[in-house]
Amino acid sequence: TLYVTLEPCCHRGRTPPCVEAIIRSGIRRVVAAGRDPNPLVHGKGFALLRKHGIEVDVGLLRTEAAAINEDFFWSVRHGRTWVSLKLAMTLDGKIADSQGKSKWISGTRSRVFVHNLRRRHAAIAVGRGTLLADDPRLTVRHVEGVSPARFVFSSTDSIPPSSRFVRTARQVRSVIVVGGGRARTRTRRKDGVEVWATGEKSRAKRLGVAMEMAFEEGIPSMFVEGG
C-alpha cells in the first residue's frame, strides 16, 4: 500500500507522470489524503490508477494534508507563487545597524529552522542590496535537502561576476528579476544566470508579475529573506 498526501500526477511535465511509476511498481493500493486541485490532474490520476486495477482510497488525514500542501493549493487557485517572508529583527524592528550593517542576532537553533524552511520551498529570494552586502550562498545547509532555485530582485541585471550567486549559477538555478525590458520575457546568459523582465516600473506590480511568471515555471512557493 502506498500512502500519499496528494493525488499522484498523470500529466507529463519536467518529470514523467507519477501514476506510470506506480502502475509499473506493482503497488496494489493507494491511500491519498485528497485530490490535486491542478486541472491537469484533478481526479484523472485516481481514475487511471483504478483503470489499471489499483484500489484507491481518498480522504485519510485530509485536513492535516491540506495544511502541509497549503502553499501548493493556494498557488494553483490564484495562478501565482505563494510567498513566505523571513525576517531576523530586533524587538524594536531593526534588521541592521544605523550604518546598514547586519548583525548576528539569531542562534544555531534558529538557523537550522530557517534552513528547514528553505528546503520546503521551491525558491528562495533576496533583493539586490542584500546580495551585494552579504554575498549569500542562498542554499540549503545544516540539514539534508536540495537547494531551491535562487532569485534576486533588482533594478538591473548587473551583478558582480565574483558573487557566489553568479559563480554557482550552473549548479543551482539562478534568476535575476528586473523591472525593465520587454514584458514577461526570459533570457539565459552565458554564465548560466536567467534574467526575467517583468516590463513593470512599479515595484508592487513588478513583484506580482514575477510571481505569475514563477508559477508558470512550476515554482509554487518562494521563501523571501529580507536583510
Residue positions per predicted region:
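Conserved S/T- and glycine-rich ATP-binding loop of Class I adenylate-forming
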Residues: C9, G93, V224
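Short, structured interface segments
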Residues: L61-V76
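Zn2+-dependent cytidine deaminase-like catalytic core
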Residues: T1-E64, G180, K201
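Short acidic/polar active-site loop segments enriched in Thr and Asp
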Residues: R28, P220, E225
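Residues that form or flank phosphate/diphosphate-binding pockets in enzymes
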Residues: R12-G13, L40-V41, A67, A133-D134, ...
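General beta-strand structural signal in soluble alpha/beta enzymes
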Residues: V4, A32, V56-G59, D97, ...
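Active-site ligand-binding patch in enzyme domains
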Residues: W74-H78, W82-P220
